[in-house]
């Protein structure tokens, strides 16, 4: 950021995440989050990943505001990013797809995820560069929130040969908690179990002049 400021660049686009927005205690259910919301990094339910994303974005806004350059910054906040991959490596989002297809989850954990198409995310970055409407804004990128069981059903339709391996029922929350004692990677799910996340991304579509691809 400092290098960009020193070079007097016209616009800075920062990639963040919705995890910088919705992690906080005492959430209602369903819980609606938006552009003005921030994750509480002091909350025990905020893990290293969500804390790092939140603090990095907050530091960016603080720096730009201190320089009087807030309007030169636009932040892109996608959800779970799915779609065409550049290589065979899986990221946090696509790892769920891989584990489902391999039959690692007999049942789907009870939580939802905002589905973001990777091409929509890329396009949002490009469109933001020359668009003054998004100056100083946080743009939530994604079409709709889907529960993991719904994701499994979509995958079964798209990949019939894997249908038998995919979860067909929702895993009780207590079972997920028990598994978390054996598998530390499951612990990050616990704070969001049973909470239906909701958000309205139409403002991002309007500002960018684009329509996000549906989850399916």
Residue ranges and their predicted role:
Residues 1-48:
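Conserved Rossmann-fold NAD(P)-dependent oxidoreductase catalytic core, especially the SDR/UDP-sugar
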Residues 40-45, 88, 94-120:
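A conserved pocket-lining segment of Rossmann-fold NAD(P)-dependent short-chain dehydrogenase/reductase
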Residues 42-74:
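Active-site Tyr-X1-5-Lys
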Residues 67-70, 83-96, 128-139:
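Glycine/proline-rich active-site loop of Rossmann-fold NAD(P)-dependent oxidoreductases
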Residues 83, 108-111, 139-146, 156, ...:
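Glycine-rich Rossmann NAD(P)(H)-binding loop
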Residues 124-188:
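Mid/C-terminal beta-alpha module of Rossmann-like enzyme folds, strongest
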Residues 178-211:
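Conserved C-terminal active-site "lid" loop/helix of NAD(P)H-dependent oxidoreductases
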């Amino acid at each position: 950021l400092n290098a960009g400021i020193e070079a007097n660049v016209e616009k800075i686009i920062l990639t963040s995440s919705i995890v910088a927005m919705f992690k906080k205690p005492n959430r209602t259910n369903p819980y609606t989050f938006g552009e003005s919301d921030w994750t509480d990094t002091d909350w025990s339910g905020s893990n290293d990943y969500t804390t790092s994303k939140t603090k990095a974005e907050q530091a960016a806004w603080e720096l730009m505001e201190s320089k009087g350059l807030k309007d030169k910054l636009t932040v892109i906040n996608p959800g779970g990013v799915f779609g065409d991959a550049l290589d065979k490596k899986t990221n946090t989002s696509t790892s769920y797809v891989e584990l489902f297809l391999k039959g690692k989850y007999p049942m789907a954990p009870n939580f939802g995820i905002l589905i973001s198409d990777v091409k929509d995310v890329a396009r949002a970055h490009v469109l933001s560069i020359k668009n003054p409407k998004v100056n100083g804004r946080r743009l939530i990128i994604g079409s709709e929130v889907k529960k993991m069981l719904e994701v499994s059903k979509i995958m079964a339709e798209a990949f019939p040969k894997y249908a038998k391996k995919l979860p067909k029922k929702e895993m009780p929350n207590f079972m997920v908690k028990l598994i978390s004692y054996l598998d530390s990677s499951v612990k990050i799910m616990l704070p969001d179990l049973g909470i239906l996340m909701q958000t309205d991304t139409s403002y991002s579509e309007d500002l960018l002049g684009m329509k996000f691809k549906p989850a399916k």
